[in-house]
Amino acid sequence: MEAFTIHTGRAVPLRRSDVDTDQIIPSEWLKRIERTGFGAGLFSEWRADPSFVLNDPAHAGASILLAGPDFGTGSSREHAVWALQDYGFRAVLSPRFADIFRGNALGNGLLPVVLPADTVEALTAAVEADPTTEITVDLVAREVRGAGQVAGFELDDFTRWRLMEGLDDVGLTLRHEQDITVFEASRPGWLPTTA
């Protein structure tokens, strides 16, 4: 997992609330077994509309998504997070996230940042007025800066540390590889090992 400390990038203003995981990545994309290649399916039904914001060349290469409240509702599918990441997003800023989506995002290195609705609105308006507007998501300081806005956000210390170290569940476990090897060596030979 890629470490996240401070990220500065342009943003895509998605003026929609209650965006569910089926809208983020439709179910026909869930047949894939790898984690890459999902960017093409991101919001694919909406992207069929030429006026959809992701189709605007002014937002090409943006790495931050500005979303309405209740982003990531619906079924639990890590594919939604993988699609956002594969498209190039490092962070999503919203007034509220579905709990399961938030957990999946944090577990995969996509930073879901909860900000007051008026802050998200101010950032969205600024990006709509000037798509070259850059926003900084500073996990070290737990702060978002851009377009004259400075807003703090909450994230527990352990999750923050994991993101800053680039550790998903597997990476965290592998930090204890030597302990695991010692433990397995002390067990009867007929028991399974990780090697």
Curated annotation (Swiss-Prot):
<dbReference type="InterPro" id="IPR000573">
    <property type="entry name" value="AconitaseA/IPMdHydase_ssu_swvl"/>
</dbReference>
<dbReference type="Pfam" id="PF00694">
    <property type="entry name" value="Aconitase_C"/>
</dbReference>
<comment type="function">
    <text>Catalyzes the isomerization between 2-isopropylmalate and 3-isopropylmalate, via the formation of 2-isopropylmaleate.</text>
</comment>
<dbReference type="InterPro" id="IPR015928">
    <property type="entry name" value="Aconitase/3IPM_dehydase_swvl"/>
</dbReference>
<dbReference type="GO" id="GO:0009316">
    <property type="term" value="C:3-isopropylmalate dehydratase complex"/>
</dbReference>
<comment type="similarity">
    <text>Belongs to the LeuD family. LeuD type 1 subfamily.</text>
</comment>
<dbReference type="GO" id="GO:0009098">
    <property type="term" value="P:L-leucine biosynthetic process"/>
</dbReference>
<comment type="pathway">
    <text>Amino-acid biosynthesis; L-leucine biosynthesis; L-leucine from 3-methyl-2-oxobutanoate: step 2/4.</text>
</comment>
<dbReference type="InterPro" id="IPR033940">
    <property type="entry name" value="IPMI_Swivel"/>
</dbReference>
<protein>
    <recommendedName>
        <fullName>3-isopropylmalate dehydratase small subunit</fullName>
        <ecNumber>4.2.1.33</ecNumber>
    </recommendedName>
</protein>
<dbReference type="InterPro" id="IPR050075">
    <property type="entry name" value="LeuD"/>
</dbReference>
<dbReference type="GO" id="GO:0003861">
    <property type="term" value="F:3-isopropylmalate dehydratase activity"/>
</dbReference>
<keyword id="KW-0456">Lyase</keyword>
<dbReference type="InterPro" id="IPR004431">
    <property type="entry name" value="3-IsopropMal_deHydase_ssu"/>
</dbReference>
<keyword id="KW-0100">Branched-chain amino acid biosynthesis</keyword>
<comment type="subunit">
    <text>Heterodimer of LeuC and LeuD.</text>
</comment>
<keyword id="KW-0028">Amino-acid biosynthesis</keyword>
<keyword id="KW-0432">Leucine biosynthesis</keyword>
